[in-house]
């Protein structure tokens, strides 16, 4: 299983959670929609997001993204010291870090 740094976690103006993996090969994520579980690749933002963001709490969506990338693409997404938090409140950042620190979701 490959480790993949998360370049940024963003909450945009519409409240969507976007997770941008640190990757030179965006085509790896382009077809994540084929998993048919509500995720898609935002080509403009180079990030994974929910097709219908209103269905998800941010913590649940992050868990879903991590599990899908792990199971479908064989990559473990990890926050690093270089991960940018864009439009994310300190409270939400703590919540999302807690979600990720609980180990690999099953």
Predicted segment positions?
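Accessory DNA-engaging acidic/polar modules
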Residues: 1-106
